[in-house]
Regions:
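Catalytic cores of alpha/beta
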Residues: 36-48, 84-98, 143, 147-166
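Conserved alpha/beta-domain cores
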Residues: 92-99, 104, 119-120
């Protein structure tokens, strides 16, 4: 379950993570926000999250690696989100530097492709197909944004995405 915590644009709140975690014990709950530092990762853990979203375009290489490793140290998974091919190589490098993406059958790191341009907010569903051949097979793939129907979910699954974020 992805829980928006960004208050200004999305009316989110960190308390929502705690509420959802309490209501759905055993369910993976991810903090979805514009995280820029390890303290926000710690906040997510303290609120009961089991994972965090890390947007590669918002982070330099050192921040991305630090936040990814810190999330893992806290026992959290990290969904590293890319929008453009520019962020693919450095995101994969950061994920690999943090250790195996899957340990004991549990995802520690996932690689997400967001087909919504964060600047214009326009959705380009074709981005999933464009980037799919370049995504490594050993890191779980997530299709983010633009998936609004079962047929679209089937399309991204056919491209090799094992997971999808549906909704805002």
């Amino acid at each position: 379950v992805s829980v928006l915590t960004e208050p200004d644009a999305f009316a989110g709140d960190l308390a929502h993570v705690a509420e959802v975690s309490a209501a759905l014990p055993g369910m993976a709950v991810m903090r979805k926000d514009f995280l820029v530092g390890t303290y926000q990762v710690l906040e997510a853990r303290a609120a009961g999250a089991s994972g965090v979203l890390l947007i590669a375009a918002m982070l330099n290489d050192a921040q991305l690696q630090d936040m990814l490793r810190y999330a893992h140290r806290l026992g959290l998974f990290a969904l590293v989100e890319i929008f453009a091919a520019d962020d693919l190589e450095r995101s994969v490098s950061a994920i690999r530097a943090a250790g195996p993406a899957i340990v004991d059958g549990r995802c520690r790191s996932l690689l997400g492709v967001n087909c919504r341009d964060l600047r214009s907010l326009k959705v380009d569903f074709g981005r999933f197909a464009d980037l799919a051949p370049r995504l490594p097979a050993d890191i779980p793939r997530v299709a983010e944004s633009g998936v609004e129907s079962a047929s679209q979910a089937a399309r991204v699954a056919g491209l090799g995405y094992g997971l999808a974020l549906v909704g805002t």
